[in-house]
Amino acid sequence: MWFHLLAADYDGTLASDGRIAPDTLAALRRVRESGRRVLLVTGRQLDDLLRVCPEIEIFDLVVAENGAVLFDPHARHVEDLGDPPSTAFLAGLAQLGVPFSTGRIIVSTVVPYERQVLATIRSLGLELQIVFNKESVMVLPSGVSKESGLRAALRRLGLSRHNTVGVGDAENDDAFLARTGFAVAVANAVPALAARADLVTTVPDGAGVRELIDGSLLADLVAFRPRLLERTIPLGAAEDGHEVRYPIRGPNLLITGDSGTGKCTLTGVLVEHLLHQDYVVWLLDPEGDYRTLADHEGIVVLSSAPGSEATRAGEVERLLRHRLTSVVIDLSGLDREEKIRATARFLHGVQRLRTQTGAPHWVLVDQAHHVFPPGRGQAGEGFDFEWSGVCLVTGEPESVAPEVLDVAGHVLSTSIEVVTERLRLLGRADVPGGVPLGTGEALSITLGDGAARRVERFRVAPRTTTHTPVASAG
């Protein structure tokens, strides 16, 4: 299961005339029964929401007041995500005859009073923003939005935006839907929102949400795989200048090439672009080649030594579950047998985490021949290699257990000889010989039925962090 969270707007999406229909509530229960979470993201003031929605506990969390308030309906805990409006601001609105209501943080009025609101903000020199929701006008602290509220909720739930399906109908839903892994507009959505959505339902509000849940979400959106494959990362430029890209949820990868031909650079480019797009990456590093990735925000390098944190799978699980942290596991301080055993432990832990949260999104194993040698493929037993987002990196593909090597459906190679000779002999990629690759060049090879369906030569994009080889300990 990839999509673990449904994040939905209230008015005009889940609710019609202020209420959620019984059939829609039943559909939300089916989402929760599937093991997924449900998040409400609404512009309504919290007190008002609790009045009109007695079934509030159907949600795991609530983002209210357009991102300004985070509410746990089970613990009844409220967290303000911004500062309340000043007395001077409220007095200024009243003086201009603006009808308004206040929540914990939000100030709400209606069109056409946005002009008086803006005049008051300017006259007092306040750092406030105006947000429109059809005929409603909301005033919030700068930087507060449904998107910022979504981020706070995801941190609390320990989930990633990429494992979230969002659904809404109005202008103020745009920012938060853009941050989800799949954006849905109900049929009654404003045209601008519908134009940017991945899917527009055929029926409005709650009926549209039911259509999404029963027709797509409970099947993990498998019918929309072509749309999901459009999310790509750049790898470099082809000879004719066009950008060579790889689908983030494409086939599992094998990155290969002789020593010194740039396969670590190519791997680093892949990882850096995944990190830039907020994907959670788990990289097993038997030789300590990727320590410099610690320069990236949101990634932790765990050092290796017998009994260190890098050999305790529980430490990695804790980081991933609670902080959505990308991790490099540096195993260079272990001997080969210890590396194989540590790999088995880590993959077992990561499999559990993927089942629970969908993350880490990518699992990369460098020097795969060290930890998956022929006859020792059991290091990967219990790990679902069929899940997209697996990358094996090795200069010796012939020294990787065949049952592990078989998971790759795409090859990136920095050495034409490795492809035309070693992989061809293994029956993995029947690629004809060609002009040797120059420095910084690579091949992108789509596999199918033991042959290459497509071969593309490209120049690898530069890395943003340096590669510093470290001597292997085993």
Predicted regions and their residues:
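Mg2+-dependent phosphoryl-transfer enzymes with acidic/Ser/Thr/Gly-rich catalytic loops
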Residues: 1-2, 21, 140, 147-229
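Asp-based phosphoryl-transfer active-site loop
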Residues: 2-18, 177
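Active-site phosphate-binding/coordination module
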Residues: 17-105
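Conserved acidic, metal-coordinating active-site core of Asp-based
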Residues: 86-179, 188
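P-loop NTPase catalytic phosphate-binding loop
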Residues: 229-362, 372-399, 403-412, 474
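Conserved P-loop NTPase motor module
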Residues: 233-234, 240, 256, 437-474
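Conserved ATP-driven motor cores of ASCE-family P-loop NTPases powering translocation/secretion/packaging/pilus
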Residues: 389, 394-450
